[in-house]
């Protein structure tokens, strides 16, 4: 995406978590960082108008619009083959970490690491004891977010394929999402 361009990500059927990454197009070692975001926002929940920052503490995206209840996770790492092995799955279970690598490889890019993603619509409240609660998404079909680029960047999305726990709703069935690039 070019600086100033926006992407609208639509939760077509509702309930679908979308792992979202963003990298500086000129330097893939600079990427959207949830740990740096926490310090910048002094919150773990980004809201409309918030700048999403990189590991260099520079704005890379702005959460411009959010028609959902606004619950997005910034704490949980992307699912990977190791997570699924712990859940008793085969080593070849689809996962967001491999989806990131595959999507970047398709355009001739490679991430130096798999950063913790912005998990759109993933409902992970923090309990009174500090533990995480694995809640179902609060969004409904057609909810969307609009993210505007603060620099030239590469955005990667993965409709989370989690089908072992109800993070994508009670049916445990991942569904597609849609996106549009806006001027």
Where do the language-model regions lie?
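Acidic, Ser/Thr/Pro
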Residues: 1-183
């Amino acid at each position: 995406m070019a600086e100033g361009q926006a992407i609208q990500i639509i939760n077509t059927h509702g309930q679908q978590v979308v792992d979202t990454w963003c990298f500086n197009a000129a330097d893939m070692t600079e990427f959207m960082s949830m740990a740096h975001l926490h310090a910048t926002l002094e919150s773990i929940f980004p809201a409309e108008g918030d700048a999403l920052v990189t590991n260099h503490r520079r704005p890379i995206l702005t959460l411009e619009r959010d028609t959902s209840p606004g619950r997005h996770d910034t704490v949980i790492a992307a699912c990977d083959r190791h997570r699924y092995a712990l859940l008793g799955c085969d080593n070849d279970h689809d996962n967001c970490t491999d989806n990131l690598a595959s999507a970047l490889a398709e355009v001739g890019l490679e991430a130096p690491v798999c950063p913790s993603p912005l998990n759109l619509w993933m409902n992970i409240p923090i309990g009174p004891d500090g533990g995480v609660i694995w809640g179902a998404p609060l969004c409904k079909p057609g909810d969307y977010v609009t993210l505007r680029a603060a620099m030239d960047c590469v955005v990667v999305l993965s409709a989370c394929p989690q089908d072992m726990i109800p993070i994508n709703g009670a049916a445990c069935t991942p569904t597609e999402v849609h996106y549009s690039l806006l001027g």
